[in-house]
């Protein structure tokens, strides 16, 4: 409003376009910024636009662009889908601290939870790089994805954004033909089209056998390191 007021009534005033972002606590990503610049390049840019949501009521949202990776070759990004109280978040926090304290790598971590805490959905977003990390948004184009709950394959789009030639780790009771049968077709198609390397382990059974209860983090983080 201050900018518009400064130019109000002046000759040769520039085109001033405004919009909203972060609605509903949505993340703001590079793809959304690209959409804003493409809107500004139009002969008649849309004013009072929104990014990050699909506005199917007043139709103010800009078209969603494909997510891009800005970290460069030295950046490694990972996402871990876990269950509240299974130790995934705690193990990832420790991993970031260990790598940050004992290597020359720059580290960044974001963690998201649902309201149920124990037994609820968790997602860890990790970045490691040779140069300072200035990405102030969640991981959207990971090199590595770990799904610690097999039911999430049918509940969430866990392969979304996983880069070509990336890696995927699954904690599951399925193996062999049973695994191939139970994987959703869209997941298998994504793996095939993007040359994804897939690892699977029954970390739940291993944790119970060695007395860790439902704390599968030790088994899975060790496997993630090997992957």
Predicted regions: what they are:
Residues 77-141, 145:
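Anionic-ligand anchoring segments at beta-strand to alpha-helix junctions in alpha/beta enzyme folds, i.e.
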Residues 88-93, 153-156, 217:
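Short glycine/serine/threonine-rich phosphate/pyrophosphate-binding segments
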Residues 1-48, 125-127, 143-144, 169-217:
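Thiamine diphosphate
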Residues 150-152, 174-175:
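Short glycine-rich anion-binding loops that position phosphate/pyrophosphate groups of nucleotides
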Residues 25-77:
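Flexible inter-domain linker/hinge segments
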Residues 166:
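Glycine-centered, small-residue-biased loops immediately flanking beta-strands
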Residues 222-227:
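Conserved small/polar residues in nucleotide/adenosyl-binding loops
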Residues 162-163:
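Helix-to-beta-strand junctions that scaffold the AdoMet/dcAdoMet cofactor pocket
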């Amino acid at each position: 409003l201050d900018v518009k007021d400064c130019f109000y009534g002046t000759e040769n005033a520039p085109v001033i376009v405004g919009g909203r972002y972060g609605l509903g606590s949505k993340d703001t990503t590079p793809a959304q910024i690209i959409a804003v610049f493409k809107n500004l390049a139009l002969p008649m840019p849309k004013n009072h636009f929104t990014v990050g949501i699909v506005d199917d009521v007043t139709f103010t949202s800009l078209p969603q662009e494909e997510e891009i990776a800005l970290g460069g070759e030295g950046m490694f990004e990972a996402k871990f889908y876990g269950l509240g109280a299974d130790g995934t978040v705690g193990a990832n926090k420790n991993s970031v601290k260990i790598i940050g304290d004992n290597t020359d790598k720059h580290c960044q971590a974001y963690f998201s939870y649902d309201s149920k805490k124990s037994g609820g959905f968790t997602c860890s977003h990790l970045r490691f790089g040779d140069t300072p990390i200035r990405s102030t948004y969640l991981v959207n184009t990971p090199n590595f994805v770990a799904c610690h709950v097999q039911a999430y394959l049918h509940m969430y789009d866990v392969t979304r954004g996983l880069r070509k030639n990336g890696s995927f780790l699954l904690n599951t009771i399925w193996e062999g033909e049973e695994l191939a049968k139970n994987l959703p077709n869209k997941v298998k198609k994504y793996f095939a089209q993007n040359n994804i390397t897939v690892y699977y382990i029954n970390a739940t059974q291993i944790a119970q056998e060695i007395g860790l209860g439902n704390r599968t983090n030790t088994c899975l983080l060790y496997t993630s390191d090997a992957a």
